[in-house]
From Swiss-Prot:
GO cellular component: pilus
Pfam families: PsaS
Designated gene of the protein: psaA
Induction and repression of expression: Expressed inside macrophages under acidic pH and at 37 degrees Celsius.
Broad class of the protein's primary localization: other
Taxonomic superkingdom: Bacteria
Complexes and interactors: Forms a homomer composed of subunits assembled in a large structure.
Swiss-Prot/TrEMBL keywords: Fimbrium, Signal, Virulence
The UniProt record lists the keyword Acetylation: no
Cross-referenced InterPro entries: Fimbrial_Virulence_Factor, MyfA_PsaA
Name of protein: pH 6 antigen
Residues in the signal sequence: 1-26
Described purpose of this protein according to its UniProt entry: Fibrillar structure, part of fimbriae, necessary for full virulence.
Protein location: Fimbrium
C-alpha cells in the first residue's frame, strides 16, 4: 500500500516538473533557415577639408601685426559635433618649422588649443563651412625661408 502512494506522488512530481519546464507544451520544428545580411553605412559625401598656405606676400623680419600663414576650410552637412586639428611630426605642439629647423608658434583664430592633447578644436555642429586661419602673432620674427606645417584634421561626434 505504501508503494502505491509513492508511485502516485512520483507521477505527480514528474508531471509538475514537465509542466514547469515547458516540456508539456514543446513544439515540433518542421522547417528552419539560417539568415544573415550586411548593410553598408556611408559617410556623408559633403565632407571636405582644404588646407592652403597664405597666397599673399609675407616679408622677413619682425611682423607688424598678426599674419595668416595658412588657411583651413572644413565642412560636412552630415551630423557631427566638431572639428580638431592635430599637429603631427615636427609640427607637434602647434609649430611650423623652417627649412633651417627653426620652430615658430602658430595660433588659430577660431579654434581653442589644448596643449595636453596637442590639438586645436572647435565644437561646432553647423552644416556650414568653417574657415579658420593659422597665424603668427605680431612681433614674431620670420626669416626669409620656407616654413612647413603638418597635421591631421578630424571630424568628431559626441
Amino acid at each position: 500500500m505504501k508503494m502505491k502512494c509513492f508511485a502516485k506522488n512520483a507521477l505527480a512530481v514528474t508531471t509538475l516538473m514537465i509542466a514547469a519546464c515547458g516540456m508539456a507544451n514543446a513544439s515540433t520544428v518542421i522547417n528552419s533557415k539560417d539568415v544573415s545580411g550586411e548593410v553598408t553605412v556611408k559617410q556623408g559625401n559633403t565632407f571636405h577639408v582644404d588646407f592652403a598656405p597664405n597666397t599673399g606676400e609675407i616679408f622677413a623680419g619682425k611682423q607688424p601685426g598678426d599674419v595668416t600663414m595658412f588657411t583651413l576650410t572644413m565642412g560636412d552637412t552630415a551630423p557631427h559635433g566638431g572639428w580638431r586639428l592635430i599637429p603631427t611630426g615636427d609640427s607637434k605642439g602647434g609649430y611650423m618649422i623652417s627649412a633651417d629647423g627653426d620652430y615658430v608658434g602658430l595660433y588659430s583664430y577660431m579654434m581653442s588649443w589644448v596643449g595636453i592633447d596637442n590639438n586645436w578644436y572647435i565644437n561646432d555642429d553647423s552644416p556650414k563651412d568653417i574657415k579658420d586661419h593659422l597665424y603668427v602673432k605680431a612681433g614674431t620674427v620670420l626669416k626669409p625661408t620656407t616654413y612647413k606645417f603638418t597635421g591631421r584634421v578630424e571630424e568628431y561626434v559626441f
